[in-house]
């Protein structure tokens, strides 16, 4: 039996799994956002660490992320808007809603995520940079 990808795309094996396994990089900011959502849903801690730069020591980030990642059950992702972030862009934003369940209570996380290219170069992969304030 084939599993659907949590991001709402296609089959996991042909959608976000190749990104999580490091077989390819996200071609767009939206694809990185979707793959990060799937990584949260599936507990792919290393992928989340690799796709978000931070001055915080890696061991601490890994420990904190591993402790928090199982507290929510991610239900559904809805992309609301995408600005730039294409194959020929250096930055872009993705606004989304991520629906979740926490101890039997349903919730929705809304965010506008800023993405940029590592090294500010088209030859480099996309990274999650920060959450922007929603208007």
State each model region's role.
Residues 107-135:
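Short beta-strand edge/turn micro-motifs at domain boundaries
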Residues 5, 77, 92, 113, ...:
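A broad, low-specificity signal marking well-ordered, structured residues that form hydrophobic/aromatic
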Residues 36-47:
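Short helix-adjacent coil turns
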Residues 68-105:
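Surface-exposed, charged secondary-structure patches
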Residues 50-79:
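Short solvent-exposed beta->alpha transition segments
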Residues 30, 64-69, 128-135:
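Short, charge- and proline-biased low-complexity linear segments
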Residues 19, 52-56, 81-83, 98-100, ...:
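Generic secondary-structure microfeatures
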Residues 1-35:
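Short, low-complexity N-terminal intrinsically disordered segments enriched in polar/charged residues
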């Amino acid at each position: 039996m084939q599993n659907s990808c949590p991001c709402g795309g296609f089959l996991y094996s042909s959608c976000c799994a190749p990104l999580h396994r490091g077989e390819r990089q996200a071609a767009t900011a939206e694809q990185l956002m979707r793959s990060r959502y799937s990584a949260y849903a599936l507990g792919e801690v290393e992928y989340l660490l690799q796709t978000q730069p931070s001055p915080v020591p890696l061991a601490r980030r890994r420990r904190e992320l591993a402790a928090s990642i199982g507290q929510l059950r991610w239900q559904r992702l809805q992309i609301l808007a995408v600005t730039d972030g294409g194959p020929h862009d250096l930055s872009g934003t993705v606004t989304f809603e991520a629906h979740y369940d926490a101890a039997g209570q349903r919730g929705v996380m809304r965010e506008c995520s800023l993405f940029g290219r590592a090294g500010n170069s088209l030859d480099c992969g996309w990274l999650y940079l920060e959450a922007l304030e929603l208007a």
